[in-house]
Amino acid sequence: MLNERFSILVLLLILLTFSLG
């Protein structure tokens, strides 16, 4: 299972990707 911090980092990266794209 993934750590909570890792999943939060992934969500932030996805949000940054969508905002930049």
Curated annotation (Swiss-Prot):
RNA-binding in keyword set: no
Any one of the GO BP annotations: xylan catabolic process
Domain of life where this protein originates: Bacteria
Keywords carried by this UniProt record: Carbohydrate metabolism, Glycosidase, Hydrolase, Polysaccharide degradation, Xylan degradation
Annotated EC: 3.2.1.8
Pathway the protein acts in: Glycan degradation; xylan degradation
Coiled coil: none
Reaction(s) this enzyme catalyzes, per UniProt: Endohydrolysis of (1->4)-beta-D-xylosidic linkages in xylans
GO molecular function: endo-1,4-beta-xylanase activity
Family listed: Belongs to the glycosyl hydrolase 10 (cellulase F) family.
Name recorded for this polypeptide: Endo-1,4-beta-xylanase A
Source organism per UniProt: Dictyoglomus sp. (strain B4A)
